[in-house]
């Protein structure tokens, strides 16, 4: 599926603030949550609905709800946690499945070190969240893991994506829809997105940077 770049004015504005070199941990963390929520709105626009009856103030009324099992949100640790609160603000009943993936800084390849999936995940929509889609190795490894667990409907939400990472995911998993706030220019020789956001994990958790 072609990657969907969500160019909503609010997303563009907030992402611009996130690109500042001197942004504080507090502001970066809050903006990651806000953009995560806005991406969630777009990524769930086609969810199926079903009708049911309730007793309203003036009698029985027919209303709608999302059909099927609850969604599971899958943050890729550790940086994916930074988007989790924003996603859950819109889908508070979602289950959370955590996947830990580490990238070798020399080979840029990923390996999985943690897997905590919710029950009946094969019947749920799995929404992967990670601020950065750089080489794509972490995302591909996570999708591999979810498909092995039986997931059939998988979507990915990232704040910023590199063309190289998009190509890697689309080649390995062409059935997975990617939603991103921005498709950036390229990767540098160290596997970082240009212009990107810097190290999103460090900025979310306040490591290796000065707090304002």
From Swiss-Prot:
Reactions listed under catalytic activity: UMP + diphosphate = 5-phospho-alpha-D-ribose 1-diphosphate + uracil
Enzyme Commission number, as recorded: 2.4.2.9
Binding site for 5-phospho-alpha-D-ribose 1-diphosphate: 78, 103, 130-138, 199
Gene behind the chain: upp
Name the UniProt record assigns to this protein: Uracil phosphoribosyltransferase
GO biological process: UMP salvage; uracil salvage
Enzyme class: transferase
Pfam families: UPRTase
HAMAP family, per the entry: Upp_B (MF_01218_B)
Cofactor: Mg(2+)
Family named by the database record: Belongs to the UPRTase family.
Pathway info: Pyrimidine metabolism; UMP biosynthesis via salvage pathway; UMP from uracil: step 1/1
Record note on cofactor: Binds 1 Mg(2+) ion per subunit. The magnesium is bound as Mg-PRPP.
Domain of life, source organism: Bacteria
Organism: Pseudomonas fluorescens (strain SBW25)
Function text: Catalyzes the conversion of uracil and 5-phospho-alpha-D-ribose 1-diphosphate (PRPP) to UMP and diphosphate.
InterPro entries xref list: PRibTrfase_dom, PRTase-like, Upp_B, UPRTase/APRTase, Ura_phspho_trans
Binding positions for uracil per the UniProt entry: 193, 198-200
Metal-binding among keywords: no
Keywords of this entry: Allosteric enzyme, Glycosyltransferase, GTP-binding, Magnesium, Nucleotide-binding, Transferase
GO molecular function: GTP binding; magnesium ion binding; uracil phosphoribosyltransferase activity
Free-text activity regulation comment from the record: Allosterically activated by GTP.
Gene3D superfamilies noted in UniProt: 3.40.50.2020
């Amino acid at each position: 599926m072609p990657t969907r770049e969500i160019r909503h004015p609010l997303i563009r504005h907030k992402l611009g603030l996130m690109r500042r070199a001197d942004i504080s941990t507090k502001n970066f963390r809050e903006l990651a949550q806000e953009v995560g929520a806005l991406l969630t709105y777009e990524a769930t626009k086609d969810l199926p609905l079903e009708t049911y009856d309730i007793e309203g103030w003036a009698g029985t009324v027919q209303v709608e709800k999302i059909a099927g099992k609850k969604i599971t949100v899958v943050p890729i640790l550790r940086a994916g946690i930074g988007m989790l609160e924003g996603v859950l603000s819109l889908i508070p009943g979602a289950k959370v499945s955590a996947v830990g993936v580490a990238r070798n800084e020399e080979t840029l390849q990923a390996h999985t070190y943690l897997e905590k999936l919710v029950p009946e995940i094969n019947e749920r929509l799995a929404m992967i969240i990670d601020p950065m889609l750089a080489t794509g190795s972490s995302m591909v490894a996570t999708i591999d893991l979810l498909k092995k667990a039986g997931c059939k409907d998988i979507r990915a939400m990232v704040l910023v994506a590199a063309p190289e990472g998009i190509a890697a995911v689309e080649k390995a998993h062409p059935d997975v829809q990617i939603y991103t706030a921005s498709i950036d220019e390229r990767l540098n020789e160290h596997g970082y997105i240009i212009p990107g956001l810097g190290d999103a994990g460090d900025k979310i958790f306040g490591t290796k940077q000065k707090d304002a």
